[in-house]
């Protein structure tokens, strides 16, 4: 028996955005417009039953934002198709969404990782790397990836080293104020790199309801603690 499930592949995300078989243009326009009107840190929850297309919805929003901000690898023809979607012009969203940078984080794919903050940092570093898409890696290699890529990129571009940060993260139960401040400073520099000229960073966190409860709670706690407390009102999730 064949499955009739439409998987959220890049091709399906693009085609359903262009053809709009689900009739979601108005909802997407309203959501994207909302992102441009609320100031400061905020969290938006997209709720729906299993199979209603939440992943499709946020990945289509991600595709639009990345296309407008020229941070994906679409062909010129496909970029033009997205940029000429009627609802973007109707709501004047092309100008409003310029500078609204975003990253996509699959929480379920990372829920066997002890420290969610490392997986999120890996996602952000990948986004920082000159718009290049980094190869997927096994979660057990995330620390090595951050150290290898982060040291090379952030030492050269931002004048900081990730090694002290990794040591902070590896110390179980480390609560020293100095360690916490170092990590806050490091994350703030990453976000500043992703949000030049006072732009905004949007993090789409998907599949949170499929995670282990302990991981979901820890993920939300670390996002609040490390991102919302000290990021200059540039972050939305």
Feature locations, PLM:
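Glycine- and acidic
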Residues: 12-17, 168-175, 201-205
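Short glycine-/polar-rich loops that comprise or flank the Walker A/P-loop
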Residues: 41, 98-102, 199, 234-236
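Walker A/P-loop-proximal flanking segment of P-loop NTPase domains
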Residues: 1-92, 102-103, 118
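Short, flexible loop/turn elements at secondary-structure junctions
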Residues: 8, 48-50, 107-111, 207-215, ...
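Conserved Walker B catalytic segment
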Residues: 175-237
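Active-site-proximal structural scaffolding
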Residues: 24, 39, 54, 98, ...
């Amino acid at each position: 028996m064949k499955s009739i499930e439409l998987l959220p592949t890049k091709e399906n995300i693009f085609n359903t955005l262009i053809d709009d078989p689900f009739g979601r243009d108005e909802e997407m326009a309203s959501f994207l417009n909302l992102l441009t009107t609320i100031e400061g840190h905020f969290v938006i929850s997209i709720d729906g039953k299993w199979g209603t297309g939440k992943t499709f919805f946020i990945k289509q929003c991600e595709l639009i934002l990345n296309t407008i901000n020229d941070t994906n690898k679409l062909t010129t023809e496909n970029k033009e198709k997205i940029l000429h979607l009627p609802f973007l012009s109707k709501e004047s969203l092309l100008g409003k969404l310029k500078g609204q940078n975003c990253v996509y984080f699959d929480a379920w794919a990372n829920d066997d990782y002890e420290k969610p903050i490392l997986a999120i940092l890996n996602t952000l570093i990948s986004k920082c790397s000159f718009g290049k898409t980094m190869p997927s890696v096994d979660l057990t290699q995330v620390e090595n990836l951050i150290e290898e890529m982060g040291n090379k990129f952030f030492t050269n571009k931002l004048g900081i080293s990730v090694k002290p940060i990794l040591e902070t993260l590896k110390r179980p139960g480390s609560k020293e104020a100095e360690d916490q401040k170092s990590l806050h400073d490091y994350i703030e520099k990453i976000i500043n790199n992703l949000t030049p000229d006072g732009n905004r960073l949007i993090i789409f966190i998907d599949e949170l309801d499929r995670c282990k409860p302990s991981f979901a709670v820890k993920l939300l706690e670390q996002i609040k603690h490390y991102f919302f407390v000290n990021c200059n009102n540039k972050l939305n999730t």
